[in-house]
Amino acid sequence: MRYVGRTLGIGLNNGKPFAFYLLCSRSFPNRRAVVKGNGVYILNQTETENPYVSYPVVRLMEDYAVVTNGLHTDFIAQALEWERPRKALVHVLDALDYERDDYSTPRIAGIIQHGGRRGWLGFVGRDMLWMRELELEEGKAFLTATYNMEGFESIELAFSTPEELAEKVMELPFEHKVLAIGIVENEKGWELSFTPSL
């Protein structure tokens, strides 16, 4: 199995957009997800001076859901107030660049739109910056990761409940999995799910 670090994806299930986040970690496996307001946060449970291991991971908005592996979650959400997803991704990722840690960890991001069938993925690493606007496909997800994944990949991913989405993400064939978060469109907005459950 591959070690991909942080992974996120966007897709379409029963005609509705969804997104997910999979935290895989060798260095800081003792982390948990916490819901606060319209956001989800990854919190590290051990002492460290590393500023990158606790961060906002999901931000739910009226029209969009944003998922990333760092503090750029909130910057992208703010940018979406006045510009389109593709520009929000490019502007924020270009401005913040990759993480200045021992691994030069890339920043990754995904956006889905309520009622939409298109999604956006973005990536910035030491020597690469890209953004893709994608036509979402029924029963599939497009995903990207911080390590050992060239660009983005497509996988089959269908589910019947938000909880099953998080469970299936946790079953993806990647090493050192810690937790998974699912984001699914519903009539009122967005629904979250977690594995392990909160």
Curated annotation (Swiss-Prot):
Record-stated family: Belongs to the archaeal IMP cyclohydrolase family.
Gene name linked to the record: purO
SUPFAM superfamilies: Archaeal IMP cyclohydrolase PurO (SSF75569)
HAMAP family registered for this protein in UniProt: IMP_cyclohydrol
Pathway(s) the chain acts in: Purine metabolism; IMP biosynthesis via de novo pathway; IMP from 5-formamido-1-(5-phospho-D-ribosyl)imidazole-4-carboxamide: step 1/1
The entry's keywords: Hydrolase, Purine biosynthesis
Protein name: IMP cyclohydrolase
Catalyzed reactions: IMP + H2O = 5-formamido-1-(5-phospho-D-ribosyl)imidazole-4-carboxamide
GO molecular function: IMP cyclohydrolase activity
Gene Ontology annotations of biological process type: 'de novo' IMP biosynthetic process
Pfam family, one: IMP_cyclohyd
EC numbers on record: 3.5.4.10
Record NCBIfam families: PRK04151.1, purO_arch
Function: Catalyzes the cyclization of 5-formylamidoimidazole-4-carboxamide ribonucleotide to IMP.
